[in-house]
């Protein structure tokens, strides 16, 4: 039906007759002459109808925005003074000779001249996707997946599909369950990841596997979360963690170079403990110059118990953030608002100190400083603080003093807030690897895996691990870019005794382990090779690379924040006959109980 895409017409086609198909993006009637901007996936081109063809002009007069049309015409150079340098096809236009209306369009429920609500955009997603911005993002996504496949396949990776209907496994979020008609009362689960299947593929001798795969998690949603999302899933045999990081870093660097013309350079590596101590996050945004600075040793002897208490507690922490030239940026009201903000993360307050004259302060320890806590500090302590933070005139210092996790999380969140709101971010791209994660964390007396229960410890036997699980480090690694976790992976457990030990540490009984993971434990008996892998969030990667504010803007048909689809009205009620065939009964849940479940979640 067409000989060219609209956005591909250029000066080399001048004098040629061509056929175009697309949508009327804009129509301008200048009396005897009608101008159309015709749009397709590749872009826009200007079409001109002049009075020499009255029948065609008559038909063109009936056109409205979003009519779907076929146009035959002759390419010509635009008249002098009418060239549009801001348009890819701005040097030419098409003289319309024939016009076929393929389909008319009703008035659009979306307004292209204003910002439409998220709900409306998702309800009419097929119209929202016609916008150039959305088309470009989906095109870019396709380029990413193509480049990923090319990179991995050039390194010997095989694209192998794994099941979508599988068994439930404890991976941290709720499963989406699918009732079985042939096995009444039993359920499949949609996979939260292909984790166990890709490990089994390594035990099958596949050695290098990848898959661009859908995953499903029934969890509370945020801007970068969806109930169904796409992973770039990778697993290898006979590779160390260093080698896996090299392979996947190479892929990401090639991706940015090819699609964005950006050289990310070599990714630095940072231990988890350093990331938490310096930045208050296991996915630090290195564009932000602010850091958390420990001052426990300076304040452990002050009379102010808010400081000396945590400073002398092995589980406590006293740390500060020094904000350059921040003293004048915050009134008392502004400081109160920041105090409320850190309170969200458990902080009971946020003392502060303004440096009005650093020379006077370093001389006296008192003069040149402004703070409600100044009376609790000796001259030596104040001077030591200023030297530790390298404070200058005009700076402000924010304090955190509490249990280690509270201080780290609250100051880490404050660091991000200040960096974004005060435009402190430096550079466009700052990648890194975070390594040496703890293997477990203890919550309410129970051990939980930081990553997942199939992650191997670093240089420990099963006996050593069970003797001191809290002190164990995992052979895991996360790739972080601009404060977002792009991907995470680890060396896997390939020894049955080690896997059984991890299950015991996590409180999984032998009976439960056999019921849920018996197939894995058995497979580990038959010469399972050392193996490791990593998974990238494709949606998040494309979101970062395109500058989108949400992963919903880089997915064709995403769900809302309530995991619903306004376009198809999913989820919906099932047909009673279908429920009978499945042996499923729907209980009526009162609203109060639903709210209680949400709060507990």
Curated annotation (Swiss-Prot):
<feature type="binding site">
    <location>
        <position position="492"/>
    </location>
    <ligand>
        <name>L-aspartate</name>
    </ligand>
</feature>
<keyword id="KW-0547">Nucleotide-binding</keyword>
<keyword id="KW-0963">Cytoplasm</keyword>
<dbReference type="GO" id="GO:0050560">
    <property type="term" value="F:aspartate-tRNA(Asn) ligase activity"/>
</dbReference>
<dbReference type="InterPro" id="IPR047090">
    <property type="entry name" value="AspRS_core"/>
</dbReference>
<feature type="region of interest" description="Aspartate">
    <location>
        <begin position="195"/>
        <end position="198"/>
    </location>
</feature>
<keyword id="KW-0030">Aminoacyl-tRNA synthetase</keyword>
<dbReference type="GO" id="GO:0005737">
    <property type="term" value="C:cytoplasm"/>
</dbReference>
<feature type="binding site">
    <location>
        <position position="217"/>
    </location>
    <ligand>
        <name>L-aspartate</name>
    </ligand>
</feature>
<dbReference type="InterPro" id="IPR006195">
    <property type="entry name" value="aa-tRNA-synth_II"/>
</dbReference>
<dbReference type="Pfam" id="PF01336">
    <property type="entry name" value="tRNA_anti-codon"/>
</dbReference>
<dbReference type="InterPro" id="IPR004115">
    <property type="entry name" value="GAD-like_sf"/>
</dbReference>
<dbReference type="GO" id="GO:0004815">
    <property type="term" value="F:aspartate-tRNA ligase activity"/>
</dbReference>
<feature type="binding site">
    <location>
        <begin position="537"/>
        <end position="540"/>
    </location>
    <ligand>
        <name>ATP</name>
    </ligand>
</feature>
<feature type="binding site">
    <location>
        <position position="451"/>
    </location>
    <ligand>
        <name>L-aspartate</name>
    </ligand>
</feature>
<keyword id="KW-0436">Ligase</keyword>
<dbReference type="GO" id="GO:0006422">
    <property type="term" value="P:aspartyl-tRNA aminoacylation"/>
</dbReference>
<keyword id="KW-0067">ATP-binding</keyword>
<protein>
    <recommendedName>
        <fullName>Aspartate--tRNA(Asp/Asn) ligase</fullName>
        <ecNumber>6.1.1.23</ecNumber>
    </recommendedName>
</protein>
<dbReference type="GO" id="GO:0003676">
    <property type="term" value="F:nucleic acid binding"/>
</dbReference>
<dbReference type="InterPro" id="IPR012340">
    <property type="entry name" value="NA-bd_OB-fold"/>
</dbReference>
<dbReference type="InterPro" id="IPR004524">
    <property type="entry name" value="Asp-tRNA-ligase_1"/>
</dbReference>
<dbReference type="Pfam" id="PF02938">
    <property type="entry name" value="GAD"/>
</dbReference>
<keyword id="KW-0648">Protein biosynthesis</keyword>
<dbReference type="InterPro" id="IPR047089">
    <property type="entry name" value="Asp-tRNA-ligase_1_N"/>
</dbReference>
<feature type="binding site">
    <location>
        <position position="485"/>
    </location>
    <ligand>
        <name>ATP</name>
    </ligand>
</feature>
<feature type="binding site">
    <location>
        <begin position="217"/>
        <end position="219"/>
    </location>
    <ligand>
        <name>ATP</name>
    </ligand>
</feature>
<feature type="site" description="Important for tRNA non-discrimination">
    <location>
        <position position="81"/>
    </location>
</feature>
<dbReference type="InterPro" id="IPR029351">
    <property type="entry name" value="GAD_dom"/>
</dbReference>
<dbReference type="InterPro" id="IPR045864">
    <property type="entry name" value="aa-tRNA-synth_II/BPL/LPL"/>
</dbReference>
<dbReference type="InterPro" id="IPR002312">
    <property type="entry name" value="Asp/Asn-tRNA-synth_IIb"/>
</dbReference>
<feature type="binding site">
    <location>
        <position position="171"/>
    </location>
    <ligand>
        <name>L-aspartate</name>
    </ligand>
</feature>
<comment type="function">
    <text>Aspartyl-tRNA synthetase with relaxed tRNA specificity since it is able to aspartylate not only its cognate tRNA(Asp) but also tRNA(Asn). Reaction proceeds in two steps: L-aspartate is first activated by ATP to form Asp-AMP and then transferred to the acceptor end of tRNA(Asp/Asn).</text>
</comment>
<feature type="binding site">
    <location>
        <position position="226"/>
    </location>
    <ligand>
        <name>ATP</name>
    </ligand>
</feature>
<dbReference type="GO" id="GO:0005524">
    <property type="term" value="F:ATP binding"/>
</dbReference>
<comment type="subunit">
    <text>Homodimer.</text>
</comment>
<dbReference type="InterPro" id="IPR004365">
    <property type="entry name" value="NA-bd_OB_tRNA"/>
</dbReference>
<comment type="similarity">
    <text>Belongs to the class-II aminoacyl-tRNA synthetase family. Type 1 subfamily.</text>
</comment>
<dbReference type="InterPro" id="IPR004364">
    <property type="entry name" value="Aa-tRNA-synt_II"/>
</dbReference>
<dbReference type="Pfam" id="PF00152">
    <property type="entry name" value="tRNA-synt_2"/>
</dbReference>
């Amino acid at each position: 039906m067409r000989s060219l895409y609209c956005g591909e017409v250029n000066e080399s086609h001048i004098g040629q007759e061509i056929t175009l198909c697309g949508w009327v993006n804009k129509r301008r009637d200048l009396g005897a002459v009608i101008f159309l901007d015709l749009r397709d996936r590749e872009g826009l081109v200007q079409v001109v109808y002049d009075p020499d063809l009255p029948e065609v002009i008559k038909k063109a007069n009936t056109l409205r925005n979003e009519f779907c049309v076929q146009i035959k015409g002759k390419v010509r150079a635009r008249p002098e003074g009418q060239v549009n340098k801001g348009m890819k096809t701005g040097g030419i236009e098409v003289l319309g000779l024939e016009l076929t209306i393929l389909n008319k369009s009703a008035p659009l429920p979306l307004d292209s001249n204003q910002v439409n609500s998220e709900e409306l955009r998702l309800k009419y997603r097929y119209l929202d996707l016609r916008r150039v911005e959305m088309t470009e993002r989906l095109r870019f996504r396709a380029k990413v997946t193509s480049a990923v496949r090319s990179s991995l396949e050039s390194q010997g990776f095989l694209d192998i599909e794994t099941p979508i209907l599988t068994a439930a496994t404890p991976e941290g979020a709720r499963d989406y369950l699918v009732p079985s008609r042939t096995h009444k009362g039993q359920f499949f689960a949609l996979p939260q990841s292909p984790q166990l299947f890709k490990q089994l593929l390594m035990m099958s001798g596949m050695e290098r596997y990848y898959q661009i795969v859908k995953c499903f998690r029934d969890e509370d949603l945020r801007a970068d979360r969806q109930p169904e999302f796409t992973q770039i899933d990778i697993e290898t045999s006979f590779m160390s963690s260093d080698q896996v990081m090299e392979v996947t870093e190479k892929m990401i660097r090639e991706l940015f170079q090819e699609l964005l013309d950006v050289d990310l350079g070599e990714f630095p590596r940072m231990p988890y403990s350093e990331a938490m101590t310096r930045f208050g996050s296991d996915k630090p945004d290195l564009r932000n110059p602010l850091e958390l600075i420990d001052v426990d040793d300076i304040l452990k002897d002050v009379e102010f118990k808010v400081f000396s208490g945590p400073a002398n507690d092995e589980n406590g922490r006293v740390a500060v953030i020094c904000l350059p030239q921040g003293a004048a940026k915050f009134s008392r009201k502004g400081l109160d608002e920041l105090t409320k903000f850190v309170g969200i993360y458990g902080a009971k307050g946020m003392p502060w100190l303004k440096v009005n004259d650093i020379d006077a302060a370093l001389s006296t320890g008192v003069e040149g400083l402004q703070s409600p806590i100044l009376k609790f500090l000796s001259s030596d302590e104040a001077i030591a603080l200023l030297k530790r933070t390298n404070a200058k005139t005009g700076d402000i210092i924010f304090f955190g003093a509490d249990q280690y996790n509270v201080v780290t999380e609250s100051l880490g969140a404050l660091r991000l807030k200040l960096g974004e709101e005060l435009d402190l971010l430096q550079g466009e791209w700052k990648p890194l690897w975070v390594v040496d994660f703890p293997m477990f964390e203890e919550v309410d007396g129970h051990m939980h895996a930081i990553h997942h229960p199939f992650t191997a410890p670093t240089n420990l036997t099963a006996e050593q691990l069970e003797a001191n699980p809290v002190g164990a480090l995992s052979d895991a690694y996360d790739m972080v870019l601009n404060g977002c976790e792009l991907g995470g992976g680890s060396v896997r457990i390939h020894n049955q005794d080690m896997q059984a030990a991890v299950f015991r540490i996590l409180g999984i009984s032998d009976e439960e382990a056999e019921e849920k993971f018996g197939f894995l434990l058995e497979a580990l008996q038959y010469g399972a090779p050392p193996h490791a892998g990593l998974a990238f969030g494709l949606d998040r990667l494309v979101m970062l690379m395109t500058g989108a504010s949400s992963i919903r803007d880089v997915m064709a048909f995403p769900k809302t924040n309530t995991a619903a689809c306004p376009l198809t009205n999913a989820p919906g009620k099932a047909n009673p006959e279908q429920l009978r065939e499945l042996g499923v009964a729907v209980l009526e849940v009162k609203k109060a109980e639903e709210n209680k479940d949400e709060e507990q979640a």
